From Swiss-Prot:
Pfam family of the protein (one): Rhabdo_ncap
GO CC, alphabetical: helical viral capsid; host cell cytoplasm; ribonucleoprotein complex; viral nucleocapsid
GO molecular function: RNA binding
Protein name: Nucleoprotein
Source organism per UniProt: Australian bat lyssavirus (isolate Human/AUS/1998)
Misc: Displays a superantigen activity in human and mouse, activating mostly V-beta-8 subtypes of T-cell receptor.
Post-translational modification remark: Phosphorylated by host CK2. Unphosphorylated protein N seems to have a better affinity for leader viral promoter encapsidation. Phosphorylation of protein N in ribonucleocapsid may stabilize the interaction with protein P, thereby playing an important role in viral transcription/replication.
Keyword Repeat assigned: no
Amino acid sequence: MDSDKIVFKVNNQLVSVKPEVIVDQYEYKYPAIKDQKKPSITLGKAPDLNKAYKSILSGMNAAKLDPDDVCSYLAAAMELFEGVCPEDWTSYGILIARKGDKITPATLVDIKRTDIEGNWALTGGQDLTRDPTVAEHASLVGLLLSLYRLSKISGQNTGNYKTNIADRIEQIFETAPFAKIVEHHTLMTTHKMCANWSTIPNFRFLAGTYDMFFSRVEHLYSAIRVGTVVTAYEDCSGLVSFTGFIKQINLTAREAILYFFHKNFEEEIRRMFEPGQETAVPHSYFIHFRSLGLSGKSPYSSNAVGHVFNLIHFVGCYMGQIRSLNATVISTCAPHEMSVLGGYLGEEFFGKGTFERRFFRNEKELQDYEAAESMKTDIALADDATVNSDDEDYFSGETRGPEAVYTRIMMNGGRLKRSHIRRYISVSSNHQSRPNSFAEFLNKTYSSDS
């Protein structure tokens, strides 16, 4: 009989069915560029830059911005931010620029234009009679791009968090080398009138392009990145969390994965490390693949690698990290099992370290140390195995390594120890938990066991 089927009786009649559930219909798309063409968008007719500035500033003062006009202006303003390419710049086989070339953000992408005119109407506020300076253009570009960052701030952030961010951004763009062009709180007022800037594809594309440029090229106006930095590794929270995790526990990626004792990690690890991507290449298009429209559904997001994401943040919770306690649990990816493994891995790496002497007063002291260490190794290798010291180590929790951790889990029947539960409760109960966060999950799951 088919191993996928189950059998049962209905009204004394034997029934055999194959249980099938809804599967994810969306395919993860990897961002590798295979046609050797730069990312591109199409915008309306290029405007007169000064006329566009006056129109956009007028619209910002009136909290009425036309997204198409904003995008057209941001693309046209790229010519103002010329810099020098520090090294040969290539990504996915595409030559972006040579070392020493004069480049602008527009060099990184292909911006196509149609003959369709923008609105460019003065919609309110004071009309500017003179032409704006480069500093004023830079301020307007910075403020507009900051709408992207504000629209990405989650509603879970309490209090005046978003308002405080907007105020700090305004302060940046009213001091040198920028120039003050709007009154206080204008940015936040404009954001409230249209809070979904991060969902506008062309605006997101331009924000990512500016960020990619200013992250590589030293420039007087690099602070514009304050509004665009969130486009870097966007929808990569799974991969970013894994990168932070291995740095936190001081292991290589290969060494860390050896601790992932669950079958559901297999597909996610394969997905995260798909060959042909530029995950480790500095200044690659990969870093901004989401904003540049190179992937519809990211294979590196927390939802795409939910088991990995859950495990990493349960370990982070065990270690008392605020970021992990505040992160959102991926409820469809075995959070109970991941919390068990997270407890054991937290115990493995929390409050312990691997230390050795690396610096010496002179060469003789170094040689003496190496000789002594070599003797210790020889003695260890000569163990006649009459005493199985490993058993005691497994129970005491002193032996380090994936084999030892796995053995401890098996000896405890795949359940958390009381010490793990006490630690989880200790870190989560003293934290003001957000809805659906890891802190809330730990409180609800283990508080009755404390």
